[in-house]
Amino acid sequence: MRVLVTGGAGYVGCVLVQGLLARGCEVRVLDSLRKPGAPLVPLLANPKLEFQRGDVRDRRAVEEALRGADVVVHLAAVVGYPACERDPWLAREVNVGGTLNLTAARSPGQLIVFPSSLSNYGSVKDGLCTEEMEPQPLTLYGATKLEAERLVLEEGNAVVLRPATAFGLSPQLRLDLLFNNFMFLALNEGAIVVYQPHFWRAFIHVRDFARAILFAIDNAERMRDQVYNLGAEALNLTKGELAARIAERLGCRLQISEDGEDPDKRNYRVDFSKLEALGFRTQETINDGIEEMARGLQVISLPNPYSNASYY
């Protein structure tokens, strides 16, 4: 099987590429390298991995990358509320324009697996978010991912995943993600400050994220042209609960702030039963993530912990 991974040098992408190569797949990565490509360097010893430096906004680069691919995993994106607000034009160009290039250039027989986002749901006060609910994104990021979802589904032969917020170690580590950020603060500043601790979020380990993409490829016949929430009920937590678990394990100070508020207003609990009914289960727990991040952050030195944010 030949798989194209856009954004394959990113936080999720480089973990996914490892998994694909372990299966014996031929993998092509299309990435603009807005972040360093060093995480892919050890993998390039494998002759089944091909790297193409290019941008999904470049139609010719996309057409070249698609040649010979059986499956496309479209990860390339400007990710998250802060990054999209910082450069709204780029966010739309990459998240929507890049997806449009991909859907227009690929052949009908090429399966697209598209990781979208639970950010599409916005804020849901009562009940669990299901795939049947009408999305109400509150941020530009959520709006662009929802628009990209619709482009992918309109063309058909696609599987859309709406993943929870990722956490855990990756060769291309992101410390802007809520869990990872709390861990960084706990270990480096000795305290976690939490705004609006009652807000609900859902989480998924980056390795489970990659496993779910592999699951979607394997089960494309059953999952085709549908949307699936990706996560686990046990990983639905309030921000306060998450911070308390980290603080208890690491012995840091926990401060609940009543003075400020999080500009990201997402607040939801999510139902993951649709994907679980097909047999997918996450394997990594919050405690697993705390333990591995505590070990991993000992050897990481970043002058700016947010310097590697924004891209998958």
Task: Show where each model-derived region lies.
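Flexible, glycine-rich beta-alpha linker
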Residues: 121-122, 136-139, 161-177
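Conserved Rossmann-fold NAD(P)-dependent oxidoreductase catalytic core, especially the SDR/UDP-sugar
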Residues: 74, 100-140
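C-terminal substrate-binding subdomain of Rossmann-fold SDR/epimerase-dehydratase oxidoreductases
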Residues: 190, 194-312
